[in-house]
Amino acid sequence: MEIRRAINADYIKIVRAIQNKGIKYITPAHVKEDISLGRQFVMMDNNKVIAILSLVYDAEHGYFAMKRLCVTNRKNNGKGYAQMMLKVVSGQANGKVGCTPWIDNGAMCHTLEKLGFSLEYIFSEKWCFYSKNP
């Protein structure tokens, strides 16, 4: 199992994995742009996509945003893959890192807190902003 930056050769595998799971919030255009800009990370095992996560610098707010986390197969839920992705990818940032889960996503909020992220505020009634400094 490895976590690394995605490359162009990963594009089709990633898109198929998110389409097979029925994910609508991550589009092929997101994947293509994130790969081309070096901000798409992928967890692979035996040439299969296990999880993806993007690390995008937000110049307006001055932090690295972790976006579009997806464990691509439901059978892999609860195995710690999301936590591994968050830990490895947040370590790639050279500054403040942020993540914005929904307030009712208790598993994600708990995982972020375990990794040392702090809840800074809640916005638009349902979004939490968690951050961590290097």
Model-identified regions with their sequence ranges:
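A short beta-loop-alpha structural element at the N-terminal edge
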Residues: M1-I14
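Helix-loop element at the rim of GNAT/NAT acetyltransferase active sites that forms part
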Residues: R16-A29
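Conserved beta-strand in the GNAT
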Residues: V42, K48-Y57, Y63-C70
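A short, internal acetyl-CoA/4′-phosphopantetheine-binding micro-motif in the GNAT/acyltransferase core
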Residues: K67-N77, P101-W102
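Conserved acetyl-CoA-binding loop-helix of GNAT-fold acetyltransferases
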Residues: N77-G91, H110, K114
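Conserved GNAT acetyl-CoA-binding A-motif
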Residues: Q92-I103
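Conserved catalytic-core motifs of GNAT/GCN5-like acyltransferases
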Residues: T100, S118-K132
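Conserved active-site alpha-helix within GNAT-family acetyltransferase domains
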Residues: I103-I122
